Amino acid sequence: MIEWGHEPTTRNAEEAALLPPLLEMLASRRWINESTIIHNEFAWNGRRVDVALLGKRNRTAAFELKLGSFGRALEQAMYNRLSFDRSWIVIDGMPKPVSLDYASVNGVGVIVVTDRPRVVLRAGLQTISPVVAKRLSAQLKVARQ
């Protein structure tokens, strides 16, 4: 399992229950490893990203954890998409087909955590401004220390 160096938390205690299964799934798929920089409640552009990752190839990913409120999660994930290489929603139940269509059209991935997490829709790889990507990568590295 990935070592955090501190106990990860979220602002919402109920949403925090989505975090351990998400991290376990990411590790089991080898999407994260010991060199991955992982932040929760990462401050970025005047908002907080629930979980932000920086991989060894400087690829970034943002995850919005939500219970039920798919519309709000999609809105936040779309903001994240402007700065992160991949943007995901992690939710506790299967969204309606129309909601999945909205996510798909906008390049946002969906992970459903019920008995075990599963990827319902893969996030598209975004083309990020090199200036934004460099700034985000630097901030993720600095915030780690």
Question: What residues fall within each predicted segment?
Answer:
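Short secondary-structure boundary/capping elements
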Residues: A43-G46, G68-R72
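Short amphipathic alpha-helical segments and helix-helix/interface helices
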Residues: L23, A77, S99-L100
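Acidic-basic catalytic patches of nuclease active cores, encompassing PD-(D/E)XK
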Residues: M1-W44, L54
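Nucleic-acid nuclease catalytic cores
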Residues: K66-F70, S83-R116
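Non-catalytic C-terminal interaction segments of nucleic acid-processing enzymes
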Residues: M1-H6, E24-A27, N106-Q145
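Basic, amphipathic alpha-helical patches used to engage nucleic acids or provide basic targeting signals
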Residues: R72-L82
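Conserved catalytic cores of phosphodiester-cleaving nucleases, focusing on short active-site segments
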Residues: L22, V51-L53, R57-S69
